[in-house]
Amino acid sequence: MNELETVIDALRAHKSILNASGVLHVAVFGSTARKEQSADSDIDVLLDLDETQKINVFDYVALKEQIREILGGGCVDVVTRQGLKKTLKDRVEKESINAF
């Protein structure tokens, strides 16, 4: 199993926990999605959050830590689709691989 499959499987295995935290959809992008990761690469994760749930900054930090732990404790960069800059959004969405 390659790194991308491992990451996708881990996120899918924790779908119910992430859903309970207000996550509707999760995707992987960046070098992991392109299968170009190296030992120094982080794992880039894109989230769609349930806007009906009020997620404050503390909840978001806890969610990022939860995802980091799910993915083995390494370097993980978590962004929301809503928080993406317009200049990055098209590229990120194009290369994203959906977990759920």
Describe each PLM feature range:
Residues 1-25, 33-39, 52-100:
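Catalytic core of pol beta-like nucleotidyltransferases
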Residues 28:
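Conserved histidines in hydrophobic membrane contexts and catalytic metal-binding motifs
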Residues 46-48:
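Short hydrophobic/aromatic beta-strand micro-patches
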